[in-house]
Amino acid sequence: MDFSLSEERKMLQETVARFFESNYQNINKRNENVNLPEGFCKNFWKESAELGIISALVSPKFGGLGGDGDDISIIFELIGKSLCVEPFLASGVLSSTILSSVSNPNLDLINQIVEGKLLIAFAHTEMNNRYEDSFIENSASLKDNKWCLNGTKSFVINGDTANKVIVSARIDGDVNDKAGIGLFLVDNDQIKNRSYNTVDGYRASELIFDTAKAELIARDNEALSCIIKANSAGALALSAEALGIMETCFNLTLDYLKTRNQFGKSIGSFQSIQHRMVDMMLEIEQVKSAVMLASSTYRSDEKTRDRNISAAKNLVGRVGKLVAEETIQLHGDRKSVV
């Protein structure tokens, strides 16, 4: 199987890499963006839209230029390398995936996302929810022929800066029923928002709905299918982002080992350290292969797609921890080498 990128995707990769490198030169620039009122740089987001980076996350059927697994993984691997904090995940992947998967897609909203004019967040996680996509306690009911939502959503990425939020809520049935689920579009002014910074610099929110007016965009099997697809797309994006972070950590550590001297020679010349670096490189290569497989089967049937994305996510969790521990330790004690 040929996993080499097409000429178009090579151009996308090179363009995005140059753009991120010029705007995220170092960690100080990232910290500046994190500390802005929105938690990210609006100008950078606008320029991303103008360059077609957001568009590359959306299918041509809905006004985009890409939207395949390879497009997602290319962009998010580079996001990981630059530690970019703009809302590519919340608006560019999660929300656009749902809006383009419903039976009556709102092309105007999707186009506004692609153009960088509209931010939409996806609110699905709840306090009592673990890993079941269908477990939903938030409720939706009709009042004067209009849908109203009640309940609380947790850990909503970019929920405080979004113009609108896509919300999952239960129309009927028990909290873990696969039927009776609805997806709703809610304006930000209908929501009580408690925002906070996450440990990695992103902005998340707890959203409270108290008879919030909402527009139904999908229900029952269609709604659940959209939720599953969005979560799969998000898992692929985050797996690729983690791969980019691992590669950067490895390269920074390799440079350090070449320049750090101890006992009259660079510590990278010690065989025990070389073995640790080789082991780490092999693990990262396995992650890269898993992400490539998940990307290549993103448009396959749901079972194949979710199996490969889950496998990549599982491997990322294990190897990511290993790489973090190893790179920190190899940057460690300046007094002696064991």
Describe the predicted segments one by one.
Residues 116-127, 167:
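A short, Trp-centered hydrophobic/proline-enriched beta-strand micro-motif
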Residues 84-105:
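N-terminal glycine-rich flavin-associated loop
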